[in-house]
Amino acid sequence: MPVVVIANPKGGVGKSTLATNVAGYFASQGHAVMLGDADRQQSARLWLGLRPTQAKPISTWDVTPDLIVKPPRGTTHVVLDTPGGLHGWRFNDVMKLADKVIVPLQPSVFDIFATRSFLDQLAAHKQAGKLQIGIVGMRVDARTIASDKLREFVDTLGLPVVGMLRDTQNYIHLAARGLTLFDVAPSRVEKDLEQWQALCHWLDH
């Protein structure tokens, strides 16, 4: 049962957007998916409450700041949305569970600096075991100097960039209805699905 953790110590970088869409991707493939939310804002849990009954099912994984309940038997894929400022024992407990960690990162010098020490922590866990780490650029305009700087920064870490996602209202409109890119006609979100291909391949391997 793969456990995919979405983590970044900085708030507002798109963790919940990634978590819900990763869960939506797994569900679209017919997997038994649970989505957990360790963030006090409970954005992912609120999103699940909006999800239509006719959409591919995604169950709630009960997670609190003090307790992570083991997913029930029959669950095949687990996604965990984490809070900003994830550190200490919570960081260690979450990393023990994780098979893969996705770090959303915006092309801003402030985001890059705020994330550096966290990525160093992750790299230490990666060396210690099975953990796979992937960086996803969020709200990226490939034509800008900022996106080039983001790639330069990630290159210095030796971590793979598994996706670069554009800034689009599609995520906002779909989230308001409890949906993901993988719940609607592909023709409506064709450009975004293209950007997800590399990330989906990484998730599956």
Model-derived features with residue positions:
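NTP-binding/hydrolysis catalytic cores, primarily Walker-type P-loop NTPases
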Residues: 181-205
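Beta-strand-loop-alpha "switch" segments that mediate conformational coupling across diverse proteins
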Residues: 141, 151-182
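Inter-motif core of Ras-like GTPase G domains
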Residues: 89-109
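P-loop/Walker-type NTP enzyme "switch/lid" segment
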Residues: 2-13, 20-96, 175-183
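Structural beta-sheet core signal
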Residues: 35, 80, 103, 135-137
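Conserved C-terminal guanine-recognition region of P-loop GTPase G domains, centered on the G4
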Residues: 113-130, 138
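Hydrophobic anchor at the start of a short beta-strand
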Residues: 32-33, 78, 132-133, 161-162
